[in-house]
Regions:
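Extracytoplasmic cell-surface/polysaccharide-interacting catalytic and binding patches
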Residues: 4-216, 221-353
Length: 353
């Protein structure tokens, strides 16, 4: 009786072992993954281990997200959606994208990845990540540098961003430039508005622009490097009152324009130890025409969507010395509101305006 019972148990164990073997042989690790066809399944099983497959299933990663990258050396399944989003935002070699994300993912957030790669090239981002400490070690990359009400303060940087619709300022009075200069540019909307402003400013003295002469408009990162270093050479620790670090200048956005002023204006600004600024010597140098131009811009620039970017009396907010001939395009409605409220950009909440 005991022998029969033991024989029966042995048979059951053998049957269990055989069944378990055949179940393992027929087990499909991708049984809970409904997205792949036979060809994709074969590749997935070739490159992924069980832990990867579990991640694939729980995160519901689609074949179109993973298949372009799965065979690339260094592929990390946890970065799959980063790779896919990067490729959609800015096409490049998939191996390059995998290496880029693996190396710099910690410097970005997934929620802003698409915006960043819409406005900055991979090479520019690498250069920023590797050299951002050169001027401002606290700099923070702006993810959407194309917003026309963007204020570059608090260590915000657009690094080497270049607007896509820069428009040459033609048929307007400009200062003489070096022969290699390609002229002055603004973004298309701002350029159109400036054209109208200059035409209407003729009423100041009968000349196109009312005697105003464009001296500066869109400025590239490389040009800003030279301008900032020149300001440091001339003003030392006070340089930030007159010029911004490369990447942190609003001229790089393509919405800011300046007209020629007396060469000695900055030198004549007196900065006290308490940070107060005195423009008495500057104003003494102003001609009657310049006084008329300043008055006209204060009274009329908003009608064309421009504001005096660094106005007198707003130094505490802007952290810049008064620059009466520097205009910033913010759109007609915003400019009108700022004019009526006597506000500078730092005092505005553009998101609700």
């Amino acid at each position: 009786m005991v022998w029969k019972r033991m024989s029966f148990i042995a048979v059951l164990l053998v049957l269990f072992a055989v069944c378990f073997y055949w179940m393992n042989q027929s087990y499909d690790p991708l049984a809970r993954y409904p997205y792949a066809d036979d060809a994709d399944r074969e590749i997935l099983l070739e490159y992924l281990d069980q832990e990867d497959i579990n991640y694939l299933i729980t995160q519901q990663i689609k074949p179109e997200e993973i298949m372009p990258f799965i065979a690339v050396e260094g592929f990390d399944i946890a970065n799959t959606r980063w790779y896919s989003t990067a490729l959609q935002a800015q096409e490049d070699d998939v191996a390059y994208i995998v290496n880029f994300i693996n190396e710099y993912r910690s410097r970005m957030t997934y929620s802003t990845l698409e915006d960043i790669l819409t406005h900055y090239s991979y090479s520019d981002l690498i250069r920023y990540f590797e050299t951002s400490d050169d001027y401002d070690e606290q700099s923070e990359l702006v993810t959407r540098p194309d917003e026309f009400t963007l204020v570059l303060n608090g260590h915000k940087t657009v690094f080497s961003y270049e607007p896509s619709d820069l428009t040459l300022l033609e048929h307007l009075p400009v200062v003489s430039t070096q022969s290699e200069s390609k002229g002055f540019y603004l973004r298309a909307e701002a350029a159109t508005a400036l054209q109208q402003l200059m035409e209407d400013a003729t009423e100041i003295n009968g000349e196109l622009g009312g005697g105003l002469t464009i001296e500066r408009a869109y400025t590239s990162f490389e040009s800003q490097v030279a301008l900032y270093e020149q300001a440091v050479s001339e003003h030392g620790e006070q340089a930030s009152w007159f010029e911004d670090m490369p990447g942190e200048s609003e001229y790089q956005l393509g919405y800011t324009v300046s007209f020629a002023l007396n060469d000695s204006w900055e030198e004549q600004v007196e900065i006290a130890e308490d940070g107060s600024l005195d423009y008495s010597a500057c104003e003494e140098k102003l001609s009657n025409l310049q006084r008329q131009q300043i008055s006209w811009l204060r009274e009329n620039a908003y009608r064309y969507g421009f504001v005096i970017r660094f106005e007198e009396g707003k130094e505490a907010q802007t952290q810049k010395a008064w620059q009466p001939f520097t205009l910033r395009y913010v759109g007609v409605e915003n400019a009108r509101t700022m004019h009526e409220q006597d506000s500078c950009m730092e005092e505005m909440n553009f998101a609700s305006s």
